[in-house]
Amino acid sequence: RKAKAWYYKGRINQDLGHPLKAQEYYLKALRDEEKIEDHALLGRIHNHIGMLYAYQKVYEKALPFQKKAVEDFHLINDSTGQVFALRDLGRTFLMLGLQDSSIICNQKAIALMRKRIIPSVYTELAGLYIDRQRMEEAHGLLRTSLQNVAKPQAKYPVYLVLGELYKKSGQIDSARFYLQACINSAPLPETRAGGLFHLKEIALEKGQWEQAALLSKQYELLKDSIEQGKNAESIRNVQAFYSYNEIEQDLWEARLYAS
C-alpha cells in the first residue's frame, strides 16, 4: 500500500514537471521492492524511473530499470506493458550505441502486438532499418505506422523518418516534402529540429550554401532551446545525495544499478 502511495505521488510530481521529486518518490516506492507482489505496479515504477533517467540522458542508469520493467510485465503476461517497456528499452540501447539490441527490442515488441498496433514501435524499427540500408522493410513499417496513427499530429514523427528514408534513397523532392511538413507543423520541437537537420544536410549535398547556413542556424537555436528545457546535469548531481540517503543502501545499488 505504501509503495502505491509513493508511486502516485511520483506520478503527480512527474505530471507537474518536477522530475527530481518524482524520482525520489519512485525510489521510495521501491524501498521494500522484494515485498511487493504487484508486478503491474513494479513494472510501472521501474518504467517511469527508467524514462526519467533516459529523459535526462543518464542512459546507463535507465537501462537496469527498463530491463526490470520488461521482466515485470512478462511475469503477468501483460503484452501491452511489455511492448511499451521494450520500446523504451530499445531507445536506451540505441542511445548507448547498441543498435543490434535496439532492433531486437523493437522486433520483440512488434511480435507481442495483437490487434492494437502501436505506430511508434514500427517507426523506430524503420529508422533502425534505414541505418542498415533495409529500405523496403523500413518503408513497409512506415506505411503501417501512418495507417494506424490515432491523431493527426502523431503523423509527424513518421514523416520525419520518411523524409530521412527518401533522402538516403535519393528521392529529394519527396524528402523535402515530408521534412518541410515537420518543420511547419510538428507539435514537438524535437521533430521540428530533425526536419531542419535533414533539410540542412540536403542543402549541403546540393551546394546550396546560403540555404544550408540558414537551416543550420535555425537548427542550432532550436536544439539549444530543447536542451535548456532538460537540465541533464541535475539528476546526475543528485546521485551523490541518493547514495547517502536511506532510499539507496548498498544492497539497493548493487541490485538495481547492475545491468
Residue ranges and their predicted role:
Residues 2-13, 25, 32, 42-53, ...:
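TPR/Sel1-like alpha-solenoid repeat signature
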Residues 33, 73, 79, 100-101, ...:
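Coil residues (strongly favoring Ser/Thr
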Residues 100, 139, 173-176, 180-259:
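Hydrophobic positions within repeat-based interaction scaffolds
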